[in-house]
Amino acid sequence: MERARRRGGGGGRGRGGKNVGGSGLSKSRLYPQAQHSHYPHYAASATPNQAGGAAEIQELASKRVDIQKKRFYLDVKQSSRGRFLKIAEVWIGRGRQDNIRKSKLTLSLSVAAELKDCLGDFIEHYAHLGLKGHRQEHGHSKEQGSRRRQKHSAPSPPVSVGSEEHPHSVLKTDYIERDNRKYYLDLKENQRGRFLRIRQTMMRGTGMIGYFGHSLGQEQTIVLPAQGMIEFRDALVQLIEDYGEGDIEERRGGDDDPLELPEGTSFRVDNKRFYFDVGSNKYGIFLKVSEVRPPYRNTITVPFKAWTRFGENFIKYEEEMRKICNSHKEKRMDGRKASGEEQECLD
């Protein structure tokens, strides 16, 4: 039995490789076979669910992204409550005998759209950090070369004191909150490199059931190597473009036509650039205002119902400040005139 299982698992892995065509990004409707072959524990846990209610959850599309030693499977599924995205992270060891580790993350397509926007911010921040890190690494290599030329009695420590005290330094953090769930995004760095951790937590309650039919158990976490954030984001964008509109229409009731939103705009002031982007989700329309000064980015989201008050307050403070500036200018001019008249009298 044990040999038969191993042979079946090996054959499944081979078929999974053929289905995806060996590319880092793939799309296949035969994905459940490849999925079960890569991590059979997932298939074993899903089999009772499928036997009890195979018609409850329908798989619409799937993509696979390979980043270093990890594989990320992005599955768009549909249940009676709507469409959702299931992300599975699979880590495969060097040899066949190594254990296969996996983790997963489940989120609605509306949250996936916000995750896509957040990934854009993290990608931009990571790009600036990369430039900084390259300069620091170049300078650090020079320091190491000079140290090697010097003779010391005691060997140098393998890592710096700062890295020992802070093995995981946080470079950027953000979060998304929806219903009874929170999604924390943390860009971190350790000795192995930089990575993005996406962690989902759920607020528990008596007899509460998760949105996608799962009980509210432990938190879900995936870890994405920073080098693959762009490829992961691109796969997410394509799935949202293909299947996200249906989810939004279902939440609206399917009767209203999608609203045409104004185009975004931006302008530069000194060394800062301000972006104005109008978006919408199941909670309504909002304005996303971003202040960008590399490598920093600050963003606020203003709901549509508060736009009028925001505009009124902006105009109010602009008028008051203009009056204050004009009054100050007039006082300075009067002071100069008075000093000039006094000088004429003295002459």
From Swiss-Prot:
The lineage of its organism: Eukaryota, Metazoa, Chordata, Craniata, Vertebrata. The keyword Phosphoprotein applies. Belongs to the PUR DNA-binding protein family. Residues 51-293 bind DNA. The modification Phosphoserine is found at S160, S163, S339. One of its GO terms (cellular component) is synapse. Pfam families: PurA (PF04845). GO terms for molecular function: DNA-binding transcription factor activity, RNA polymerase II-specific; purine-rich negative regulatory element binding; RNA binding; RNA polymerase II transcription regulatory region sequence-specific DNA binding. Residues 1-34, 133-169 are annotated as: Disordered. Keywords: DNA-binding, Nucleus, Phosphoprotein. Residues 134-146 have a biased composition (Basic and acidic residues). GO terms for biological process: regulation of transcription by RNA polymerase II. Residues 9-24 have a biased composition (Gly residues). It is found in: Nucleus. This is Purine-rich element-binding protein gamma. The keyword Phosphoprotein applies. Isoform 1 is expressed in testis and glioblastoma. Isoform 2 is expressed in fetal lung. Its main location: nucleus.
